UniProtKB/Swiss-Prot annotation:
Residues 40-114, 230-239 have a biased composition (Low complexity). This is Late embryogenesis abundant protein 76. Lea proteins are late embryonic proteins abundant in higher plant seed embryos. The lineage of its organism: Eukaryota, Viridiplantae, Streptophyta, Embryophyta, Tracheophyta. It comes from the Eukaryota. LEA 11-mer repeat repeats lie at residues 31-41, 53-63, 75-85, 97-107, 119-129. Residues 28-39, 115-127, 136-145 have a biased composition (Basic and acidic residues). Keywords: Repeat.
Amino acid sequence: MASNQQSYKAGETRGKTQEKTGQAMGAMRDKAEEGKDKTSQTAQKAQQKAQETAQAAKDKTSQAAQTTQQKAQETAQAAKDKTSQAAQTTQQKAQETAQAAKDKTSQAAQTTQQKAHETTQSSKEKTSQAAQTAQEKARETKDKTGSYLSETGEAVKQKAQDAAQYTKETAQNAAQYTKETAEAGKDKTGGFLSQTGEHVKQMAMGAADAVKHTFGMATEEEDREHYPGTTTCTTQSTDPTRHTYEKEVRITGTIYEPSFFCFNNVMCLCFVISVVSLCL
């Protein structure tokens, strides 16, 4: 029985010892597990911190690189903008200079063209004015000449009729006188015919002078002797070819042309000459 108790006590002691050992082992395991957990947690924290530090460093490096790159880009863009702005400014100045030169050239051309036009217009106006003045002078000369000829035409015609009548009456008187003296008798023929011939000769010369005066063939002295009212005028005219010529006409009180009565005077002169020939 004693041995059973001893065995029971020994077993109880062993059980307690085992229990204590198990508790101690459990406690140690718990502590070891706790230490492991702490170590793992510490390692994780360290790793996390290392990762955070590395990420922070990486972020800082990336940010610095980005900042540097951005600054480089900004610097390059600023330089590019400045270069482009300088090029645009240079191009704009060149365009403005070219436009100014073009404007000056165009203005100078317009001024030259305007001056040429004004000079041409002035010359044209002067030429037109000179032509108009010449035309007016020619018209005035023509009007004066036409009026003068119109006024003198009737006087010329009247003078021609008077001269023709004078020549006709002179010839008739000579014929009548010759006829009357021829009937006076044959015994007085010699002396009478001599006187008659002289008288007829004088009348014929008077008729001839009248005809010469009519034709404008008499001299100025003869005109003044037989026709005291006779004057001599000189007319000057200019033809279209600018050749100037003078025409001298002897008139009795006015200008006339002999063509109006040329035929009658010639007939009267022939009649007088025939009578003189018969008497002589």
